[in-house]
């Protein structure tokens, strides 16, 4: 019995020590407030760190997103902001990005977890769908600083799908301290 417990203990310790640490690419960087260049890159931007729709005395947080432009050069672009589910950014999301970029859309994929030091949140106790929505509206505000970006849609799934649904409601939009609004949203 002790041998089995010892083996189980070794396996658990090995798994924990091999787990990938969450790294925040925005540490020691400043928030971008304007997007001038039409190039693919990682962007650090400021969001409201709120679990709910009460924004009084809430801290801001520097989070990141990856910006992807289509190879086709245009005078103007439409864009999509992508928000992941409770499992965080996944490799298969790249296929979604490629599909949307191939359609001629600019894609901005938000990482809601790195700055918050979260690997995944299956309990929804650390962040909420509203937290994700706040990040998406902050990303929208940033994207709209680029005069080449016209319409911006909002795409989310699983926990990340809460924001696109809520963004359709006037009562929710009235509470959000950002003026810009999404042209469309899909959950």
Predicted regions: what is each one?
Residues 1-2:
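N-terminal secretory signal peptides that target proteins for export/translocation
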Residues 15-17:
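C-terminal motif of bacterial Sec signal peptides marking the signal peptidase cleavage site
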Residues 24-75:
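N-terminal cap/lid segment of alpha/beta-hydrolase-fold proteins
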Residues 44-52, 57, 63, 127, ...:
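The alpha/beta-hydrolase serine catalytic core
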Residues 5-13:
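Sec-dependent N-terminal signal peptides
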Residues 54-64, 76-145:
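Serine-hydrolase catalytic machinery in alpha/beta-hydrolase-like enzymes
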Residues 19-21:
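Bacterial signal peptide processing site
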Residues 137-187:
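Primarily recognizes the serine-hydrolase "nucleophile elbow" in alpha/beta-hydrolase
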